[in-house]
Amino acid sequence: MQHDASSLPRLILASSSRYRRELLERLRAPFDVVTPEVDETPLPGETPSATALRLAAAKARAAAERVRAPHGALVIGSDQVATFDGLQIGKPGTHERALAQLQAMRGRDVEFHSALCLYDSRCGQTQIEDVVTRVRFRTLTDVELDAYLRAETPYDVAGSAKSEGLGIALLDAIDSDDPTALVGLPLIALTRMLRAAGYPLFDAPASAADGANGQ
């Protein structure tokens, strides 16, 4: 059964990340990108999972407020927080902090909480899930870590390693139920949520190449 695009809810990705955009394009459904403005500072005493879930929901709702859609919108929000030894590892922001993160994590097991939220503006319903990925980092030298950072500048990602790029060379093992979660957009969970929201996955009205056009 072919669906009329004009009657479907608008699919929105609440993220400026090109990696999340590339992942969503795999579903071959049209979507638009809206960059949310959300303070990503963890709350005092907040667990890594709680931080990721709260921010994913906040991003989805912030983007939804900026969207006009006659037939409603399904807004995808996501956030990722890394943790080891009970400490949250966020986005480093600078080369120095990124190097310190990688030095602390080498040879260690680290958990990445990839939170996903699907907000349905038609009814106000929210589906939300935290997909956990366990990663073991290789024991690399300071020279190797510094060279990686200068090559890929991963200062805007939790844990200072882009597994979708050269950062895969920092890792010794990955344990996850969803291979896309570590990149930041768990597609297995997302497709489950979209189906629950009644969005057609196998007869989408247009290819992803027609989407991602901004607001």
From Swiss-Prot:
Classification via CDD domains: Maf
Its EC number(s): 3.6.1.-
Subcellular location: Cytoplasm
Active site: D79 (proton acceptor)
InterPro entries named in the record: ITPase-like_fam, Maf-like
Domain of life: Bacteria
Reported cofactor(s): a divalent metal cation
Catalyzed reaction equations: N(7)-methyl-GTP + H2O = N(7)-methyl-GMP + diphosphate + H(+)
Site (Important for substrate specificity) location in chain: Y19, Q80, E164
Any one annotated GO CC term: cytoplasm
GO molecular function, one term: nucleoside triphosphate diphosphatase activity
Keywords recorded for this protein, A-Z: Cytoplasm, Hydrolase, Nucleotide metabolism
Any single GO BP term: nucleotide metabolic process
Protein function: Nucleoside triphosphate pyrophosphatase that hydrolyzes 7-methyl-GTP (m(7)GTP). May have a dual role in cell division arrest and in preventing the incorporation of modified nucleotides into cellular nucleic acids.
Family: Belongs to the Maf family. YceF subfamily.
Protein name in the entry: 7-methyl-GTP pyrophosphatase
Protein species of origin: Burkholderia thailandensis (strain ATCC 700388 / DSM 13276 / CCUG 48851 / CIP 106301 / E264)
Taxonomic classification: Bacteria, Pseudomonadati, Pseudomonadota, Betaproteobacteria, Burkholderiales
